[in-house]
């Protein structure tokens, strides 16, 4: 059979590469062609759908961003680092990172090198569909016969590279198989249960590369090969004699590829193709506006269902709450399971840890917020009293600091007392904006999806702040801080948290601090750390007071205290359990006391801690000279 | 017949039970962690609903315990279950082999500083019900000519966030009693009670409530206090909601009294942990049956009396102490007959 094929060879290229088949076609390519055509059509329709559901303004933003050199560069860098190399996973779990980059980057290189090879040695086949450009580069090794006498250095390098990357991918696949059996070995306590489509795609993905090795191995004596495919060829020859019946392996290889592409849109592997789009959207600065359409749809399909967020979720201290993890939220959104979507959306504490550790960067708390909006934004509210001039006193703070305590600080009067003492001790003049009557900062309303209501209070507050003539807005509650920073658009006014304020005073030497031998651990409040990116200032300032110990999980991996305003339905017992595990994490290195910088965290942690819990301002008040 | 009975806790329940067991002919060993007998009763001034003296009531109880081996400033160091008895090593070095144990460890007052929004321990003008009783008892009132005084009901009771959804049963009547008393001391002050709902379930409690309104002019506001702030002159600004008129209100007070509720006694719980006594969700010990056998624990020979199985009024506690004595007597007799 082989000799007939070779006899039918049509053209001889200078490098000694000969097409073994007339028309460069064989029936075995059909499964692959069907699969790849399906996925291309599906992707095109999907892309049009997603773009259609973006608002006109967002579309323009996206288009413009593609031509801004800085954003374009960032796009390229992000796509390379996140989609191919998976730097985020590498940083957290190196073995898991290796597995992902082996499969993603390895496969990518196989495709690129395969096309390069064809472009160099058989450029005719890239010229159009009729020349087999769809499948020819993929099955290049099947269609050619290489004259060993004409072997070139360039060809050998390609053979080597192809085998090298195939080995690279195979090592990743081996790890992936091992992970299925023992996920803990790769650093994952919980992993997701795959759906049917996931399984089909998963098993065909696993099979693709070993089959490719077999198929290319079987034909390695005809088409050439390197350190991997050649030995396979020799070995099988030793077993089966000279007449290798290679057709079944090529068929199997093609079928697996086809199956993978057919299952892809219904499986988690859609993330491979969606992630680049998500990166473009994110870098263009688009926002989620609807929970299932436009940007959100890109996020939903970019979720790789890896389940890293299950271990990260603070609710997982109880197994019954595992079902509220982001990965399941996204899964139910994708399946339009409305009842479950709303239940999960309302339960979430919105601590943002899942988004912080997500390898793809899916911001699921934001989608949950928008999902809440669909139900809660239409609820009735009446803030007409905000318009009457008598209800709220207008603060006057010409050139001074304006201090906004917020409702949670008012429920923890020690914090307010301490902040005021520090302000006085540092000789700063200030005005207390909500000492007596104040308006809600709007963040709790935003979190519960009552965006319209939030806009009312935000607008009223914004007016008060801008008209006060202050230069700095000092905030003692991170919940308020986040909304002041993100939604207020206060021009010419510096919005700072009291940890930043105190840190500045420490740096400028404006507080006379008595250093103690006390050891402390600092708890990162969600809204301050992950929410506003403030990790270093509180730590730096605290180091001037005593020894700062580390907690196993801190900074962007810090655990939520459990009492976040974000959850609309989590009950007190469950919250208590979360607080307990947060305290346990903080006490690992046996500090003398716990310090935090959020009134909510302060209350929660204090209720469960066995060591004293201090507010950041309070501990400074205890250790500075207040009045001369 | 000189069976040893160990009674843990020398409050009203422990005293009353000891007296009864002694009368039945048992050898009673009563231990109390404080230096004085009487528990919370020893710190109180007058008792609702009739305003009788706590001191006299306690004297009447202690008069009856002659012949009881009584150790104050003593705690259980270790407790072991033997075949049909309990072996307790006390902190004073004495070892007791008891045929039955009665736990009458009572309650601790809720730590009012946990409700930080009320400012206990932060603002000088904020005190608790126990602080006020102490002031009454020592006749050292903290204020001169106050203009307004407030009482907050349900501090640490019926409050899921404070970790206690249950009612503490006695605070409503205590608050009304204290409000009347304070009005007697300061007739010119306005007195407010902030309540959720008033649970005036006992005989004469309702009369007390009516008297408070009619004779003393105490103003009852249905709604919880949301926050308390200190003003420049040291007075307190209290924000609350009047849920009957659906309006937020704010009043300026000279003193705010927090009606701290009942929590399980920590000393009692540490005894319980020695022999793995079970507690219910509220932290109080679980009885064999909440209707028929509230004095019995799930361990043979181990009994309860008083507030260690949940908030109780003084009369309830005394009844339970007596019935626990009867149960212990029955248990001992049945056990000896088997021998």
Give residue spans per PLM region.
Chain B
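Residues forming the flavin
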Residues: 1-339
């Amino acid at each position: 059979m082989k000799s007939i094929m070779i006899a039918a060879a049509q053209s001889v290229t200078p490098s000694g590469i000969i097409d073994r088949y007339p028309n460069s076609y064989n029936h075995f390519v059909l499964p692959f062609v069907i699969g790849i055509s399906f996925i291309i059509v599906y992707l095109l329709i999907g892309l049009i759908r997603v773009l259609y559901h973006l608002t006109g303004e967002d579309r323009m933003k996206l288009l413009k961003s593609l031509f801004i050199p800085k954003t374009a560069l960032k796009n390229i860098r992000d796509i390379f680092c996140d989609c191919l190399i998976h730097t985020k996973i590498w940083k957290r779990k190196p073995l898991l990172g290796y597995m992902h980059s082996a499969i993603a980057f390895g496969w990518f290189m196989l495709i690129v090198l395969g096309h390069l090879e064809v472009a160099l040695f058989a450029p005719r086949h890239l010229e159009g569909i009729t020349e087999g450009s769809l499948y020819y580069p993929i099955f290049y090794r099947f269609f050619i016969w290489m004259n060993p006498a004409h072997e070139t250095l360039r060809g050998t390098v390609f053979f080597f590279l192809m085998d090298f990357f195939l080995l690279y991918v195979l090592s990743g696949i081996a790890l992936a198989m091992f992970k299925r059996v023992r996920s803990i070995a790769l650093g994952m306590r919980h992993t997701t249960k795959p759906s049917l489509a996931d399984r089909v795609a998963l098993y065909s993905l696993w099979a693709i590369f070993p089959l490719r090795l077999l198929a290319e191995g079987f034909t390695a004596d005809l088409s050439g090969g390197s350190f991997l495919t050649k030995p396979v060829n020799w070995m099988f020859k030793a077993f089966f004699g000279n007449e290798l019946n290679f057709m079944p392996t090529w068929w199997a290889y093609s079928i697996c590829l086809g199956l993978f592409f057919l299952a892809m849109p219904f499986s988690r592997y859609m993330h491979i193709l969606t992630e680049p789009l998500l990166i473009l959207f994110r870098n263009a600065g688009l926002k989620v506006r609807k929970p299932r359409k436009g940007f959100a749809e890109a996020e939903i399909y970019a979720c790789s269902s890896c389940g890293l967020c299950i271990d990260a979720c603070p609710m997982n201290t109880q197994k019954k709450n595992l079902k509220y993890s982001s990965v399941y939220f996204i899964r139910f959104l994708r399946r339009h399971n409305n009842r479950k979507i709303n239940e999960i959306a309302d339960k979430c504490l919105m601590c943002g840890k899942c988004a912080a550790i997500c390898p793809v960067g899916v911001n699921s708390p934001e989608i949950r917020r928008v999902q809440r909006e669909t139900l809660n934004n239409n609820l009735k509210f009446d803030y007409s009293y905000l318009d009457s001039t008598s209800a709220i006193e207008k603060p006057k703070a010409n050139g001074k600091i304006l201090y906004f305590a917020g409702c949670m600080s008012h429920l923890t009067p020690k914090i307010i007392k301490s902040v005021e003492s520090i302000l006085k001790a540092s000789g700063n003049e200030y005005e207390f904006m909500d000492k007596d009557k104040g308006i809600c900062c709007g963040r709790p309303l935003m979190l519960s999806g009552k965006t319209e209501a939030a806009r009312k209070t935000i607008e009223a507050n914004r007016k008060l702040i801008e008209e006060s003539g202050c230069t700095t807005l000092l905030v003692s509650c991170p919940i308020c801080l986040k909304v002041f920073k993100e939604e207020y658009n206060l021009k010419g006014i510096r919005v700072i948290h009291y940890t930043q304020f105190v840190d500045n005073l420490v740096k400028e030497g404006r507080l006379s601090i008595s250093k103690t031998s006390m050891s402390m651990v600092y708890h990162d409040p969600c809204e301050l750390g992950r929410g506003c990116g403030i990790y270093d200032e509180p730590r730096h300032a605290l180091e001037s007071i005593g020894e700062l110990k580390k907690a196993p999980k801190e900074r962007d991996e810090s655990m939520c205290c459990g009492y976040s305003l974000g959850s609309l339905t989590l009950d007190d017992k469950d919250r208590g359990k979360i607080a307990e595990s947060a305290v346990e994490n903080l006490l690992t290195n046996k500090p003398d006391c716990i310090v935090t910088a959020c009134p909510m965290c302060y209350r929660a942690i204090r209720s469960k801690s066995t060591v004293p819990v201090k507010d950041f301002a309070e501990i400074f008040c205890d250790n500075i000279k207040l009045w001369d | 017949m000189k069976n040893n009975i160990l009674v843990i806790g020398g409050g009203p329940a422990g005293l009353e039970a000891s007296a009864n067991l002694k009368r039945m002919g048992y050898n009673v060993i009563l231990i109390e962690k404080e230096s004085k007998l009487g528990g919370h009763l020893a710190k109180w001034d007058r008792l609702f609903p009739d305003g009788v003296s706590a001191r006299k009531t306690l004297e009447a109880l202690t008069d009856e315990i002659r012949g009881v081996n009584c150790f104050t400033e003593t705690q259980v160091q270790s407790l072991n279950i033997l075949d049909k008895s309990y072996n307790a090593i006390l902190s004073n070095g004495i070892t007791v082999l008891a045929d039955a144990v009665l736990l009458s460890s009572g309650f601790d007052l809720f730590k009012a500083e946990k409700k930080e929004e009320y400012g206990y321990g932060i603002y000088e003008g904020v005190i608790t019900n126990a602080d006020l009783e102490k002031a009454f008892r020592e006749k050292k009132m903290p204020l001169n000519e106050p203009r307004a005084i407030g009482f907050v009901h349900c501090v640490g009771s019926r409050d899921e966030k404070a970790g206690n959804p249950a009612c503490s049963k006695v605070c409503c009547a205590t608050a009304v009693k204290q409000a009347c008393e304070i009005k007697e001391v300061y007739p010119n002050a306005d007195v407010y009670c902030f309540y959720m709902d008033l649970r005036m379930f006992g005989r004469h409690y309702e009369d007390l409530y009516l008297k408070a309104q009619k004779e003393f002019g105490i103003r009852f506001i249905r709604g919880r206090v949301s926050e308390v702030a200190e003003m420049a002159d040291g007075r307190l600004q209290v924000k609350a909601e009047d849920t009957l008129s659906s309006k937020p209100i704010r009043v300026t007070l000279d003193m705010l009294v927090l009606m701290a509720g009942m929590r399980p006694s920590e000393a009692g719980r540490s005894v319980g942990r020695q022999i793995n006594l079970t507690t219910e969700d509220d932290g109080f010990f679980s009885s064999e049956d909440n209707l028929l056998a509230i004095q019995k624990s799930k361990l043979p020979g181990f009994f309860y009396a008083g507030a260690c199985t949940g908030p109780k009024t003084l009369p309830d506690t005394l009844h339970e102490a007596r019935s626990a004595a009867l149960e212990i007597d029955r248990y001992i007799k049945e056990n000896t007959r088997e021998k």
